[in-house]
Amino acid sequence: MSGDVFGNGMLLSRHIRLVGAFDHRHIFLDPNPDAASSFVERQRLFELPRSSWADYDKSLISEGGGVWDRTVKSVPIAESVRIALGLAEGVTKLSPPELMQAILSAPVDLLWNGGIGTYVKASTETNAQVGDKSNDAVRVDGQDLRVKVIGEGGNLGVTALGRIEFSASGGHINTDAIDNSAGVDCSDHEVNIKILLDSLVRSQLLPTQERNPLLASMTDDVAALVLADNIAQNALLGISRVTASQMLGVHRRQLTDLTKARGLDRKLEALPTDKEIERRLEAGVGLTSPELATLTAHVKLSLKDDLLATELPDNDFFAQQIPQYFPTAVRDRFETEIKAHPLRRQIVATMLVNEVIDNGGITYAYRLAEETGASSTDSIRAYAAVREVFALDEVWSRIRSAGVSAEIENELIVESCRLLDRASRWFLANRPQPIAVGAEVARYSAAYRATAPLVPGLLAGHQLDDLLVRAQSVIDRGAPEALALDVFRLLDVYCLLDIADIADIADHDIAEVAELYYALDAHLGIDWLLSAVSGLERGDRWHSLARLALRDDLYSSLRQLTMEVLAGGEPGESPQEKIDEWESTNASRLSRARAALVEIFESGTLDLATLSVAARQVRSMVRSMGTRSEVGR
């Protein structure tokens, strides 16, 4: 449509009630629009050659509306228009620039920018700084907008600082790069498909006359692939907004690292200074959605650069994913040729980075580097291993197809990512490096499939109570019960990694080991301590590392205690009988630790110092303080 040169956004839904619009020639007003008839008329104008808003059927415009040339001296403002645009009482006429400002500032649901020009800035910016003199008389400040959402079909319609100001004022906006990403993604697919088809024609695997019809036949498939990428990226930003305040400390460190190591210019990218971040930390607010979008872009670019500097994109486990980038029509016929694509490394790297960041979060790889010293490729390998072992793709698919609210969906995804984080650290800390993803998946996925169904029946006491309370919080708000329980049980099945190792080392049936592990966990109250550790404030990096060290210490002790109790038990004994025998045999050593733990439990004090003492008491129960047994190295 005229003025919407990029996307024709007003033709993408039959339910739009278009109150006002303007381009370089006209101003359109329809204060009480009929969605159905106005859509049909917009469609007619779109199909009419050389049309403008002046061609709009005036009989379809509600009372008080109309179409005016931008060159008129003033436009009469009917009462219906005054109400629709939220103008002050007594306003009866406005100049064209004033009316366009009123349209931009109207209290409506959506402000759609599809044209050329910058129409919104921050109150801290001058028109001269914006650099779009032709729209100086029209431009408004982000803090003055009353719209709920801004959609940017065009580029540069809002300044970077204007977006941040609007977002900080409660508005919903990402960036033009995010809202326009489908176009770029579509172009990338088109170019890569054409490279493939041209190589097929040259090698005589595809007749020349079939090339163009085959390309055209893939239009819908390409659209689906592109939309899937866009949905995933917007889902990432949705979750990132939810966790923005609690992750601000990590974001600050990540920005500092990108600035020092990657040359990020915070001022140029409109990203907050350390001083501004300190202010937000005190206020309890995080990065805005536009800032998160910008950070995401830099994280993805830097991670992709890291991957392309290594052999990871050539690794068979990862390279085998490249056919999924292409539409089914060529994927099924030319899989071998796809795997030999000239840009296969770049395509594989892009696919991996998008998946890991979109699913794992903006800080996933960065936190693993902080916590374990993992390289970018290490984090990709860890992600892939955890995804496959715990069938996380299936979990995420169930969450996203459950039909729950965005709020509930985000909560469930965040909970699932706790398993992703924890299990990723486990693989990085406990398995040979670099992680041989295929071998690790073969080893642990079988153990998971065999044992995970048993876990619901093995939880008891605080383990079960905590699970039910957390799951009920989303069940009460509409989440399916089975899904909620499965998602909130993920941290309980995380232990199956240790359980699989114990079974292998001790040469015992994994189901027997699992029964003892969970029983001992509940008996000693380690699950209670782990929950308390999770409740500690994240604070700065050192507080976060202290929390991780505590958690790892508790899990390590539980692993060694399970092996010790298992070794002292007799075949055919129940888990409780094994525990009773172990406690009887080691009564003097255990009594001191148990007494200290009881005192801690009863004190109700759950700070870092107290929990550190508790972890030390649990560790003192272990007979041997030697090194951890190693498996499969």
Regions picked out by a protein language model, each given a short descriptive name:
Residues 1-633:
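Non-transmembrane, aqueous-exposed alpha-helical and coiled segments at domain scale
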